[in-house]
From Swiss-Prot:
GO biological process: transmembrane transport
Record's protein name: Uncharacterized ABC transporter ATP-binding protein Rv1273c
Record's keyword terms, sorted: ATP-binding, Cell membrane, Membrane, Nucleotide-binding, Transmembrane, Transmembrane helix, Transport
Residue stretches in coiled coil: none
Source organism (scientific name): Mycobacterium tuberculosis (strain ATCC 25618 / H37Rv)
Membrane topology: Multi-pass membrane protein
Gene Ontology terms: cellular component: peptidoglycan-based cell wall; plasma membrane
């Protein structure tokens, strides 16, 4: 998986990689040539007292060193550019794919693990790419070239290489084989600690309200300790790599000096050749060390690549059709459900069964029912946040699955049950509700705020009023009104309010509904509500109970003909004659 991921995302940088490899090749060859020049200086210059040879070869050595340094600097620069671009592209690919996920895929992975995979996991692979960029050509050429040059200098001592290099390779392989499962566990534990932190921060009010700080501390401590222990185990194995490598290099160097000294003493080898052989021996083992350091990063990067590939290979449940359809004259807002049935993944029973209804432009359809009856799921099907498992949802006679999702959603103004606001300003959040090509003016923003009865509390600091993440610096009712204003900005063909007035007092609720009727015009309005006072004003009321429609009609007819609706109304102490605003 790691290789496939690297190959896919490194492709745009092939030219940079080719230049990088060329510079590394020249730099490595220059490094391999230096010990030979040094040996010649010792044997032909110093040993014979030939100053001219020393100066001439010294100049050559200086020139080769300069070339090696320049090429090395260029290789580092290109490697950094390649790594930075690779990391940017991989993060973008993750983000672009994740935003296509429906609630099903998001819930399957969980927000904390998606955040970890998009940031920490990408960082681990980027680290591997940057390390690989420095050893991609250097290590193999230095190793092979060093062996060739060492044999050229003194073939009789090459048996030391045949002993030391395999020992080093086998030892490092043994260490890495133990590190891989530990790194896989570490990434899972990082997800866990992020999940605990997210829960604690998101539910800080609940934690304090129930004085559960101690419990949360213990839960975090357990997750933190588990991660720390896994990291310690992996670190212990990783820490073995450098001592093993150093021990092998030092022991091999001592053996080389010993046996080389014996050959010099017997006149079979010159001092310069021993110095050159030592240099090549060090270069060979250094190449193995560089490869080892890269291999130390490889296990964790491999695990991260598996996790990233899992996300990127997960298809979005709500894909776009090959040949999307769209009404010739634009969306007018006729919404029809024909035998719609929906079952959540893994559930035994459908949450909605055989739902059929029609909502027309210029009318308001209220959907009422007890908690858990399936009201929110029903409007999620209309907005195509989920796809039906049977039946169909049609907008202007076209199945919503045949629309391009962006064009469908641009025709719908949704105010969800939980009104989420993005960090920034009020103006930023209102612009978020604009159409793809819509330039939202300040006048339109203030008009939307007026419709949502939100202009009063925004008036003090204006449109630049700061909004914290999630809108936590506003009350529940204020968040709902800002979310309503955001939906109004677009002037969509279909308005969907999923219990979006629950935090408003009766007076503000009535004011917002009156303003919505004025600006909605011929738009279709679908309201999920728990308030009979809201349902009483609707042109059509749909009563949902246990996933089925048990009543359809006006407020008055349902009071007479639908026991479920009558009980619902009675529970709110509303008389059978109510027809106006409650």
């Amino acid at each position: 998986m790691l290789l496939a991921l690297l190959r896919q995302h490194i492709r745009p940088y092939r030219r940079l990689v080719a230049m990088l490899m060329m510079l590394q090749l020249v730099s490595t060859l220059a490094s391999l040539y230096l010990p030979t020049v040094n040996a010649a200086i010792v044997d032909d210059g110093v040993a014979k007292g030939d100053t001219a040879t020393i100066v001439r070869l010294g100049a050559v050595m200086l020139g080769v060193t300069g070339l090696q340094v320049l090429c090395a600097i260029g290789a580092v620069y290109l490697g950094s550019r390649t790594g930075a671009g690779f990391g940017r592209d991989l993060r973008s690919a993750m983000f672009e794919h994740i935003i296509t996920f429906s609630e099903r895929e998001t819930a399957r992975f969980g927000a904390p693990t998606l955040l970890t995979r998009s940031t920490n996991d990408v960082r681990q692979i980027l680290f591997l790419v940057q390390m690989t960029a420095t050893v991609l050509v250097t290590a193999p050429i230095m190793c092979v070239g060093g062996i060739i040059m060492a044999i050229h200098q003194e073939a009789a001592l090459t048996w030391l290489l045949l002993v030391s290099v395999p020992i080093l390779a086998v030892a490092n392989y043994w260490i890495i084989s133990h590190m891989l499962p530990l790194f896989r566990r570490m990434q899972s534990l990082i997800d866990g600690i992020n999940r605990v932190m997210r829960d604690q921060l998101s539910g800080v009010r609940v934690v304090r309200a129930f004085t559960r700080e101690g419990y949360e501390r213990d839960k975090f401590a357990q997750a933190n300790t588990a991660l720390s222990n896994a990291a310690l185990s992996a670190g212990n194995w990783q820490a073995l790599m450098l001592p093993v490598t150093t021990l092998t290099i030092n022991a091999s160097s001592v053996a080389l000096i010993w046996f080389g000294g014996l050959r010099i003493d017997s006149g079979q080898m010159q001092v310069g050749s021993l110095i050159a052989f030592l240099s090549y021996f060090a270069q060979i083992l250094m190449a193995v060390l560089m490869a080892t350091m890269t291999l130390a990063v490889l296990p964790r990067a491999s695990v991260c690549a598996e996790r990233i590939t899992e996300v990127l290979s997960t298809p979005a449940a709500l894909g776009n059709p090959d040949n999307p359809k769209f009404p010739t004259d634009g969306v007018t807002g006729v919404v029809r459900l024909a035998g719609a049935t929906f079952t959540y993944p893994g559930a035994d029973c459908p949450v909605l069964q055989d739902i059929s209804l029609t909502a027309r432009p210029g009318t308001t359809t209220a959907i009422v029912g007890s908690t858990g009856s399936g009201k929110s799921t029903l409007v999620s099907l209309i907005c195509r946040l989920y796809d039906v498992t049977a039946g169909a949802v049609l907008v202007d006679g076209i199945d919503v699955r045949e629309y391009h999702t962006e064009r469908l959603w641009s025709a719908i103004g949704l105010v969800p049950q939980r009104s989420y606001l993005f960090s920034g300003t009020v103006a930023d959040n209102l612009r978020y509700g604009g159409g793809p090509d819509q330039v939202v003016t300040e006048q339109e923003m203030w008009e939307a705020l007026r419709v949502a009865a939100a202009d009063g509390f925004v008036q003090t600091d204006g449109l630049q009023t700061r909004v914290a993440q999630g809108g936590v610096n506003f009350s529940g009712g204020q968040r709902q009104r800002l979310a309503i204003a955001r939906a109004v900005i677009r002037r969509p063909a279909i308005y969907v309010f999923d219990d979006a007035f629950s935090a408003l007092d009766v007076h503000t609720d009535a004011k917002v509904h009156a303003s919505l009727r004025q600006v909605s015009g011929d738009a279709t309005i679908i309201v999920v509500t728990q308030r009979i006072s809201n349902a009483a004003q609707a042109d059509q009321v749909i009563v949902v109970d246990n996933g089925k429609i048990v009543g359809t009609g006006t407020h008055e007819t349902l009071l007479a003909d639908c026991p479920t609706y009558a009980e619902f109304a009675a529970s709110q102490s509303l008389s059978a004659t109510v027809g106006g605003v409650g």
